[in-house]
């Protein structure tokens, strides 16, 4: 994963260099990554893991998966709200005449990248569930999937001799495809373990604690 990350960074600088587009992409990618650290890999996961573990021990996988569905539904609704509001605000900012060019480009690219937040935060919760039932391979491979997707997008842009202004959007698409795969692959693995996605609106004791 680290080698692929290094290759990705090398390709990013080979294609975008120290250009305005590179700075704008880094700025845009910071926002979903911040939410990933706060929601996907931060406080929320730290709160969910012990509760999921307790339910898994007391009620087995059926109860644990029900709790997981409760968490995923509420997280999905929260993320949809923030992504929707964020995209509207970013579209307005990117079209504002008073915004510096770099910030305007960053806001425009962030409109493309903000949905990545949806994929990666949901993926983090599912991966936490997989880890707790002893499934480690797929969660560990998710960063590799993102790097491969971004590398593929950059290579495609280079192969087509695209300009930096076009390659940066290829890179955004690569991030979105990678994020979708980061959610899809753990979901498939969890489905094989007996999980079934359900819309569970009721809040049990564990959700109240959470």
Question: What do these predicted ranges mean?
Answer:
Residues 1-210:
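Membrane-embedded alpha-helical bundles of multi-pass transporters/translocases
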């Amino acid at each position: 994963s680290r080698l692929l990350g290094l290759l990705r960074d090398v390709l990013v600088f080979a294609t975008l260099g120290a250009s305005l587009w590179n700075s704008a992409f880094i700025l845009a990618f910071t926002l979903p990554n911040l939410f990933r650290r706060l929601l996907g890999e931060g406080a929320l996961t730290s709160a969910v893991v012990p509760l999921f573990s307790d339910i898994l021990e007391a009620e087995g996988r059926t109860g644990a998966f029900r709790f997981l569905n409760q968490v995923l539904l509420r997280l999905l609704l929260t993320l949809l709200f923030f992504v929707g509001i964020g995209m509207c605000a970013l579209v307005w900012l990117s079209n504002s005449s008073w915004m510096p060019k770099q910030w305007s480009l960053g806001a425009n690219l962030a409109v493309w990248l903000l949905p990545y937040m949806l994929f990666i935060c949901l993926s983090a919760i599912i991966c936490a569930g997989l880890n707790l039932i002893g499934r480690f391979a797929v969660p560990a491979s998710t960063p590799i999937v993102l790097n491969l997707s971004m590398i593929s997008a950059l290579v495609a842009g280079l192969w087509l001799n695209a300009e930096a202004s076009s390659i940066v959007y290829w890179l955004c698409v690569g991030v979105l495809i990678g994020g979708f795969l980061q959610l899809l692959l753990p979901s498939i693995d969890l489905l094989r373990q007996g999980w079934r996605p359900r819309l569970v609106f009721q809040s049990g004791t564990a959700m109240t604690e959470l």
